[in-house]
Amino acid sequence: MIFRLPPLEQLSKLIQNRLLSNLPGPQAHLRMEPETRKAFLNLKHAEAPRQSAVLILLFEKNGKIKTPFIRRNIYDGVHSGQIALPGGGFETHDNTLINTALRETEEEIGIAKNQVKVLG
């Protein structure tokens, strides 16, 4: 079976409408996760988790919908060398996590925020 995505404008409207409705939240995650993961739900972080945001950028090229990824730098840390969506940590001047995602996307892949239509 081949799954074909609708054109980008139509897909954008579908995503926006879906984001306006109730999302399945934790219950959907619980249905899909392995039993072994449930043991970790009550663990506490040593420090408060850092707020961060990513941008799932969709664009059309040669009739196909695409999304860019980045490869993180190699360093001594848990995210070293990972393939990831553009994004990063919240900074107070961002004011919102959407602004964080837009700022980080511009820093990491050079797409200016005025070139992005935020769906949600």
Language-model features: locations:
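N-terminal leader/linker segments that precede catalytic domains of diphosphate-processing enzymes
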Residues: 1-84, 89-120
